[in-house]
């Protein structure tokens, strides 16, 4: 049996900030198998973002082996964000709004 997907402590903050600037956000963390945490639609573009908690030590922010494999094998865009500003950069916004 698969264990419940963990949600990073900052995921709700990042999702709320993305929605505030007009992005649509679909959580994907429950998919598992290394799939990124969220799918973001913004200005007619799609973005996959893996969320890591920037407040945790670097060793706790590393991609898991499944995430590394998924990122390596995916033939499209995928980003990692540790905070709102990095999530905005991932969708081509330059600063927090």
Which residue stretches match the model-derived regions?
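Catalytic phosphate/metal-binding cores of nucleic-acid and nucleotide-processing enzymes, i.e., regions
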Residues: 1-97
């Amino acid at each position: 049996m698969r264990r419940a997907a963990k949600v990073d402590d900052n995921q709700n903050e990042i999702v709320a900030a993305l929605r505030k600037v007009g992005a649509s956000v679909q959580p994907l963390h429950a998919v598992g198998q290394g799939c990124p945490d969220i799918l973001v639609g913004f200005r007619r573009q799609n973005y996959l973002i893996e969320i890591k908690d920037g407040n945790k030590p670097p060793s706790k922010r590393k991609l898991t082996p499944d995430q590394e494999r998924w990122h390596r094998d995916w033939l499209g865009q995928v980003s990692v964000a540790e905070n709102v500003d990095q999530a905005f950069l991932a969708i081509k916004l330059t600063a927090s709004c």
